[in-house]
């Protein structure tokens, strides 16, 4: 008899659930491609997800649904849907989903890029804007930028004297790393624990941070898959390599109090209670988490911007000659380049905009997560849905840009579109609350380096390679890097 009561109760309970589900209005989710069991749509992303998403959007629209393993996602690929995510619903969409390996590398999300939108994030954001990346602080590091660029120029002068081919991808990354290490850590890259491995570590860090980690999409077996593929081991190698470098740099500051006025000095003062992070007490892990963003984002994003700019210039000799003519005519004292000098280089600014457009360093922004149920472009986006913003799709949209695959700086002559977060047709640094706070610092390095390389040297491709033969293919990751290293030969000029 007791069993009958239990069965009857279960039947009634099930009936109520079914009735409730029938009364619940069906959500109008964004359309998307059919999915396979278990893996969903992962197989459709391929090696270049930013391009695959664009192809899928041609069928399923500018806001589409994808199922990536167990994760429900939507992808925004038009300027209208991107504006909705980054502006209209910025507050509701500015948090981050939990991602295992970024959490590991950032000391359990004690950074700015991957941490969720909460009180801690707001305090760290305030710290970076008010203390770390102010115009005054950017200017205070000018001598470091000038010294490292001068060293880079001397290297290229020696190479030019012997007509030696330079691996610009590698050398630009090293120069950028030297600038960031001195600005952020008060330490020369040469002689540090990262001297011989930093390029490998930085590249692998971005591979880990930008990977589709199985552990995040397949909770039950993902860890096993990542151990088999080597992603877990790569993450641990990256973490311990950079952590050891941080320990060295921090200990150097502790042992020598005369090292002042860099970013570690500021953070150590806050650890000692000489500053404020709101209600949070800054610990050593907080310091390292913040430094992680500075090391990785600061080095590689600037380096890749310069590498792509030189790539497109070498592939387009007409643009290269026109830009060099402007720089050599308008720069009166190359040894004293100022922000005012950059302002008068109108064509240089067009070239930089076109580089950001055609080769966005972050093609798909770091995933966001919906904080509540939203209505975007007429579709329902449920709470906890991951949101991918495909900026490459917008930058390469033929409805916005004529001949988008062509490198053409002149397209911006009568186009006032800027890249500082207000024009959603061009967002190399993002927009809204999650916009990159280090834009000014990065641009200062990019401006000074490119102007010197183009003013002082002519450039030619090695082995008789023609401009049209230069590969501009990219590798996908958290940042978009050139698939093949950029190699070129500097040529001495009267300005060298």
From Swiss-Prot:
Protein family: Belongs to the cytochrome P450 family.
Assigned EC number: 1.14.-.-
Keywords of this entry: Heme, Iron, Metal-binding, Monooxygenase, Oxidoreductase
Cofactor annotation: heme
GO MF term set: heme binding; iron ion binding; monooxygenase activity; oxidoreductase activity, acting on paired donors, with incorporation or reduction of molecular oxygen
Protein name in UniProt: Cytochrome P450 71B1
Coiled-coil region(s): none
Chain's gene name: CYP71B1
Pfam families to which the protein is assigned, alphabetical: p450 (PF00067)
Positions that bind heme: 436
InterPro entries xref list: Cyt_P450 (IPR001128), Cyt_P450_CS (IPR017972), Cyt_P450_E_grp-I (IPR002401), Cyt_P450_sf (IPR036396)
PROSITE patterns, alphabetized: CYTOCHROME_P450 (PS00086)
